[in-house]
Amino acid sequence: ADQFGFNEDQREQMAELLADENNSLWSQVLYGITGGDGEIVTVALSQVGNVGGEPYWSWYGFSSRVEWCACFVSWCADQCGYIEAGVIPKFAACASQGVPWFQERGLWQDNSYEPRPGDIIFFDWDDGGQDGQSDHVGIVEKVENGRVYTVEGNSGDSVRQNSYPIGYYEIYGYGTPAY
């Protein structure tokens, strides 16, 4: 504010606009995100382009690189306070930790579900045959025209935006956090 020469009234207005309770408004303005939870999507989008995932796997507690897609989702959730609040689990493994957590709480939908922003999308990649176990995870950014748009960590060893048709055979299902 100093570098722009804001007066006291302008500083107060800026502080009001940037207050936490306006995060969903800014998600709508900046990213077109409505419904669901825009806060975790905003955090995830801010990380697009990261290569190697070091901030996420090291935050989780690993001392060297691991398959870090779940660490990325957990890190984003932690930035929003969702792990501490019990809204999303801290997990590093999709099949043994992430999926069961949502299923046990009745917060699970199969791949025919039309997701909302902030839902957690799990995949069962067809790399040598699907095994009925989730092996990748991301965050739903939005749904438009029958496609689900995602932000995924460890997608080609970076944070990337991707999209898939709703009901795509490699989508294992969705965790639907109770935001």
Map each language-model feature to its residues.
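Non-catalytic extracellular/periplasmic "stalk"
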Residues: 1-30
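...with weaker cross-activation on analogous glycine-rich loops/strands in unrelated enzymes
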Residues: 83-157
